[in-house]
Amino acid sequence: MIFLFIIMLMFFALKLERAATQGLNLVTSLTTTEAVRANILSDLQSDMARQGIQVLTNPQQGVLSLSENILFDKGKAELSRRGEEAIAVLAQSLYRNLVCYTVPGDGLPPKDCPTTSHSIEAVLIEGHTDSDGGDVANWNLSVKRSFNAYQFIMASNPDLPGLTNRNRQAIFSIAGYGKQRPAHPNDIDENKQKNRRVDIRLIMVPPDANDVRTTP
C-alpha cells in the first residue's frame, strides 16, 4: 500500500514538474516573441524616419501609428499626396521587415533571413477617428481610411499580397473602430488630432505555440 502511494506521489510530482517546465518555456517564448516584434517595429520606424516621416510605435501593443496629418486631410478618406508618399515608403519597409517572418508567395524566404521560428500571424490596418461627429460617420470614415491605406500599400509593393502565415493565409486585413479606441482622451484638440490615425498592428505567434500545452 505504501509502495503504491509512493508511486502515485512520484507520478504527480513528475506531472507537476513537466507542467512547470512547459509553463516556463511558454513564458520565455512569448517574451522572446515580444522582443522580435519590438525590433521589427523599431526597424519600420527607422525606415520611415530616414525618409522624413515621423511615426509612433507602441512595442507592448505591437502597433505603429501614422497620424491623420501624414495621410489624410481632416474628414477625408482619400489619401493625400503626402499620404501616398508615406504609404509607399511604408509598403517597401513592411515587405523588407516582414518577409523573414512569413511565408512568401514562392515559399522561399530570402537567403539573408535570420534563422528564426517566430512568425507573423496577421497585420491589421486599423482606422481610428476622434469623438467629433456622429457614430455612423466616424465608423464609415475609419473603415474607408483603413481600406484606402490597405489598397495603396498592396499597390505599392506587389509582393506584399503574397505573404502568408504558417497556415498559408493572407496576413493583411483591415478594421475600422471609429471613436471606440482612442489613444488619448478626446478632451482637447491636441488629443483629438492624435486619435485621428491609422495603426499598423503586428500579431505574432511564438515558436511551436501549438505544441506548448499541459499534459491532461
Kindly label every feature range from the protein language model.
Residues G52-S65, C113-E121:
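Short edge beta-strands and adjacent turn/loop segments
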Residues A49, I53, Q92-C100, Q151-D159:
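Sec-exported extracytoplasmic/periplasmic mature domains
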Residues V99-K111:
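Short acidic alpha-helical/loop segments enriched in Asp/Glu that coordinate divalent cations
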Residues L71-R81, P110-P216:
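Periplasmic OmpA-like peptidoglycan-binding domain that tethers envelope proteins to the cell wall
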Residues M1-A35:
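Short terminal targeting/anchoring segments
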Residues L30-M48:
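N-proximal, solvent-exposed amphipathic alpha-helical segments enriched in charged/polar residues
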Residues V36, N58-N97, D130-W139:
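Short, solvent-exposed beta-strand/turn patches at coil↔beta or beta↔helix junctions
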Residues N97, Y101-T102, T116-S119:
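An N-terminal amphipathic alpha-helical segment
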